[in-house]
């Protein structure tokens, strides 16, 4: 599961928030060819999707499988 953000700063803010909540994340290149998104995103286990979505509810992102 990939959490794709518009700004790189949001990737790092989301990473910190999720890791502080016990969710393992990995910063990886964005798999989306859409130029609207920044070049990196967060890779998160699919079983953490619901918890991650709740924690990031105030951020602007897109989930890509």
Regions found by a protein language model. Give the residues of each.
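Low-complexity, intrinsically disordered short peptide segments enriched in small/polar/basic residues
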Residues: 1, 8, 24-25, 60-61
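Short glycine-/aliphatic-rich beta-strand segments at the starts of folded cytosolic domains
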Residues: 1-4, 40
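C-terminal structural segments of small proteins and small subunits
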Residues: 30-33, 37-65
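A short glycine-rich beta-strand->turn/loop micro-motif centered on a GG-aromatic cluster
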Residues: 5, 24-33
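Short amphipathic alpha-helix segments
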Residues: 6-22
């Amino acid at each position: 599961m990939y959490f794709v953000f518009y700004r790189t700063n949001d990737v790092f803010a989301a990473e910190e928030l999720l890791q502080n909540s016990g969710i393992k994340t990995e910063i990886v290149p964005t798999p989306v060819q859409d130029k609207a998104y920044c070049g990196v995103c967060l890779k998160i286990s699919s079983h953490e999707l619901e918890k991650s979505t709740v924690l990031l509810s105030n951020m602007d992102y897109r989930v890509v499988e």
